[in-house]
Amino acid sequence: MWGSKGAPGFRENALFQDYHGLKTFRQAMASFMEQIRGGKSRFDPDRIVLTAGATAANELLTFILADPNDALLVPTPYYPGFDRDLRWRTGVKIVPIHCDSSNNFQITPEALESAYQTARDANIRVRGVLITNPSNPLGATVQKKVLEDLLDFCVRKNIHLVSDEIYSGSVFHASEFTSVAEIVENIDDVSVKERVHIVYSLSKDLGLPGFRVGTIYSYSDNVVKTARRMSSFTLVSSQTQHMLASMLSDVEFTENYIRINRERLRRRYETIVEGLKKAGIECLKGSAGLFCWMNLGFLLEKKTKDGELQLWDVILKELKLNISPGTSCHCSEFGWFRVCFANMSENTLEIALKRIHEFMDRRRKF
């Protein structure tokens, strides 16, 4: 099962593990999280709580921070899985922060206050704001000033800030990404810092969704303590931890992997965005992730949810391309679609773009 060069044997893997996670793996994970952020932030291994993926991490944090019928504010468009992860078992509500293309879907103070007031008017207690940075489905990062404003808002409202940074190692224009950890590093007030919690996973940056490895990193002692007590429901196997601790501790490998992965993502992103542009289709400027945010609003016969889904159905059945309609992400504008481009060959991408070009040519003839 394992080699003889210091790797753990079957017995060591099979016995009960530390529910907090193996120290070696938490140390390796902390170092890797620092590495993908360019060393701009420091992570304490003792503040890392392991979970079976980011899904479990987000749900666990929701259980800790909120009670049934409380709410989290989430900017739109957002990852459709949040409707499951944050709501199904916790009984917590999602109140959308409506963002639009007028400022590239960045969160504005007005939209934030409006969402908070909507919840208050409905007698719903708001317990926090949850963002994804970089964003899924936008493929864009949250500006530093927006992060600072978000934290100020959370302090004023006495609520929490959760930053899901699952794509933080897949930023192909690294200078554009600011982790909330960088904001916290410059804050001395513990009462402010302890409102911030980060979710991370190896599913996207290392392409290991089947390994089910996620983390909660909290600046709150109480949240760390509570998350550890509850983490027995979402443990990561000893074998997985040992293997990944060894892999992540190989700094030469991780540095090369991050560099090559970012370069490949950048090239792939530029290929698809340029290809779509030649077909007359514009995309939101992106800098991270495995997808682009494509605007087909000009093709809608009706500027409605049904109109968007009708176009999606045509693309699915005629072009045999499965893209995600913006309505599934609760987008406030109709006609936006998420296009995933990473998990396919160059040849497959070329075929997809060819079909899109032919589709657009047919549309122009009508």
Predicted regions and their residues:
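Conserved PLP-anchoring active-site segment centered on the Schiff-base-forming lysine
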Residues: I64-D83
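Conserved core segment of the aminotransferase class I/II
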Residues: A119, E182-R266, E270-L276, E358-M360, ...
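Helix C-cap/helix->beta junction micro-motif
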Residues: R156-K157, A279, L319, R363
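N-terminal small-domain helix-loop-helix segment of the aminotransferase-like
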Residues: M1-G53, L60, E110-A111, L248-F253, ...
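Active-site phosphate-binding strand-loop segment of PLP-dependent enzymes
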Residues: V95, D100-E176
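Conserved glycine-rich beta-strand-loop-beta hairpin in the small C-terminal domain of fold type I
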Residues: N261-V273, C283-F298, E333
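PLP-dependent enzyme catalytic core of the Aspartate aminotransferase-like
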Residues: S31, R42, S191-V192, T304-K305, ...
